[in-house]
Amino acid sequence: MKFVIESISKNSGRLGHLRIREGGPDLKTPLLLQTTKGGSIPWLAGDVFEHQVSQEPQVLELTLSNMGHMADALQQWNNQGRGVSDYVGFPGNPNLLLLRDPCETTPSGSNDRDIQPLFTRRGRESLTAETYIEMVAKIQPDIFQGLSDADTNAESSKKRAQKSVDRTEKFMQYIYEQSGKVRGTLLAPIVGGYNTFARTQSIKHAREQPAESYGGYVLEGFHNNGLSATSLDTSKLLPIVEHCVKQLEEDKPRIIPGAYTPLTVLELIRLGIDVFDTSYAYCATHNFKALTFTFVKNEKEDKPFLDITDDTIKEEFTPLLRDCSCLTCQKHTRAYLHHLYKTNELLGPILLMIHNLHHYMAFFERIREAVANDTLPALTELVKTQNGKSSSDFSIVQNTKVISKATMSKGFVAAAV
């Protein structure tokens, strides 16, 4: 993996170029990873994504919690000279393997001195540093993160934060020694919750290793994934991230997974974070929300979301978002999307995911323009107010409206998921 910084500005973060594979595509940063479930982009077949969302090369964000059960099959596949991206139906696309799924809440607890819990759809599994590197060696991703204890959030105690660092250091000492079993590039995990001393210790341990032993950083332990990332207190988050970034080398990319809100993403880019993912778009789709926030100056005040379960849009024969060029907005209406959810049609989340990914990827195109022109503060203010006078709320709350077959003719009914 090769990372080159193009420019650094005082107020707008930095632009860079990331090349994951030799001879592979030149990817511009700030970069957006495509979050997957078991290697598949949620609700979208590979050809649907390529024809209706983007034909540009994408970096697939894989997670061991969704891919671990495929390790043995992938080992045989890789022995035939193929890669994991080919296996999941995205041939030629670079990929990155994380430990935890940023789209789903990671249960807290079950931590042991020598074991890291891995929560999968099959239940809880126990990982040692040895079993972890063996599984990663079978999958052979282009980039992979080191084994870490990131079970911390804003409420974690100082003792828990320190334990996360101590356990991660112990895991990583073995990972650094055995990383040669994997052809891909290792990312050093930076943990320690919201404790600056613990974060500094985690960074120090990584930087004590030979520079060539890892190619970048993944900053974890700020939230428990899922919707929790959309409601973080930035007054607590940003000082910790800034504290970390100041101690990291400039020539290594910094990755921060999770469903951070667009406003938080802009602030993190200002601080120097390079790589994010599309888990926010997934969380919006999963909770029946269309992304409608604007990043273009106009005279009309906009809102962050459109709730397609809302009965008030059942006769609105207009696109989800004006001037949007995605398939959903060009061919369908708000009323139709509402109807699809009323009738529990599979096409509903497909069309919604097409729109949300298209909109979120366009947002990152606009971000790169703003960073290049050193106008990120103006973009941040625009996104914050949505052409209005007050701050907008981008947090996503779990939608508890579900469809019951017995009451399908009556539409949505309130029920706990």
UniProtKB/Swiss-Prot annotation:
Location within or outside the cell: Cytoplasm
Positions contributing to Zn(2+) binding: 324, 326, 329, 355
First-listed, main subcellular location of the protein, grouped into a coarse class: cytoplasm
Cofactor(s) listed: Zn(2+)
One cellular component (GO) term of this entry: cytoplasm
Function description: Non-catalytic subunit of the queuine tRNA-ribosyltransferase (TGT) that catalyzes the base-exchange of a guanine (G) residue with queuine (Q) at position 34 (anticodon wobble position) in tRNAs with GU(N) anticodons (tRNA-Asp, -Asn, -His and -Tyr), resulting in the hypermodified nucleoside queuosine (7-(((4,5-cis-dihydroxy-2-cyclopenten-1-yl)amino)methyl)-7-deazaguanosine).
Name of the molecule in the record: Queuine tRNA-ribosyltransferase accessory subunit 2
Source organism: Drosophila ananassae (Fruit fly)
